């Protein structure tokens, strides 16, 4: 009888040692290569109706139980283009689509669409500025919207970990 109990305890310990219980909790994509697309994307549509794009992303997120990723920037900004390139990597793009409804918001040279961020209490002082909302519309990365504004100094995995880390701490 004691041998069976010890065997069960050993089996549980082995499973725990393999990390199977923790693997399900971490859904961050793993960036297998650091090669970003070339040329880097130009993700911000200067002619877009940003308010309509944000409203549509929020509506889709609410309907689908996803988070919203609001990315404020400009095509002139290398950090913004690097962030967009990371989001387009094969190993990242699918997870982004499963987790987020994304709206890319052009701020020009800090002269337009700033009121959208201000509605969440964010004054845009650097780009990219990223606001993550949960499916109920709550701002989950408050205090850190410019964490990716130096994306060129970050490895792609660090960018992914930052974005998905905001989601995992919100759940």
What are the language-model segments listed below?
Residues 46-68:
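A short beta-strand-turn-helix
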Residues 72-74, 105-108, 133-135, 144-145:
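Active-site-proximal beta-strand/loop segments in catalytic clefts of secreted hydrolases
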Residues 72-87:
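Conserved redox-active cysteine motifs that mediate thiol-disulfide chemistry
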